[in-house]
Regions:
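Short acidic-glycine loop/turn motifs at beta-strand connectors
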Residues: 47-50, 116-117
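C-terminal catalytic lobe of FAD-dependent flavoproteins
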Residues: 62-68, 82-160
Length: 160
């Protein structure tokens, strides 16, 4: 559905995530969301059931998932999580782990365009600024649907 020019604007990365078993006492810390951008991009959320979702350590996708590398990433995440919470170090265990692909562009703007097929539009690759891109993207798409021009369309164009 998308052309080669659009594909050239995107890069694919892998992000890794672990979910802990419930940790008694973690809710008492009242942590909403933590993002550590200094050490290979880590983020965490504490869930109502006392689990922690901890992820990051993003890297370029090489075309095929390397399960050995993924397992090493999960263990690295566990080690880093324990460093963040030394008082819970003995209680932190992985219950689930998973990874996923995401697309980005070099300037972190999404790609919005019309497919070669009738009435099919696309909005791809929100990257690191997904919420901001989404707000802009919705306005651009609504204008495209209505055949109106939009001053920001050129920044999101696959021909930029």
């Amino acid at each position: 559905l998308i052309d080669q020019n659009t594909q050239k604007l995107m890069t694919m990365d892998v992000s890794y995530t672990i979910v802990t078993k419930p940790i008694n006492g973690i809710q008492e810390l009242k942590l909403p969301l933590i993002q550590d951008t200094l050490t290979n991009y880590h983020y965490l959320r504490v869930l109502k059931d006392n689990r922690i979702i901890f992820g990051g350590e993003d890297e370029a996708f090489g075309g095929e998932l390397d399960y050995d590398k993924a397992n090493k990433k999960y263990l690295s995440l566990l080690k880093n999580l324990k460093k963040m919470f030394p008082c819970f170090e003995d209680k932190i265990e992985i219950e689930y782990s998973f990874c996923g692909l995401f697309a980005s562009t070099t300037n972190n703007l999404g790609i919005i365009g019309k497919s070669g097929r009738d009435n099919i539009y696309y909005f791809l690759s929100c990257g690191a600024n997904g919420i901001i891109n989404t707000f802009c993207g919705v306005d651009i798409l609504l204008d495209l649907f209505s055949s109106k021009s939009n001053e920001f369309e050129k920044y999101f164009s696959p021909q930029r």
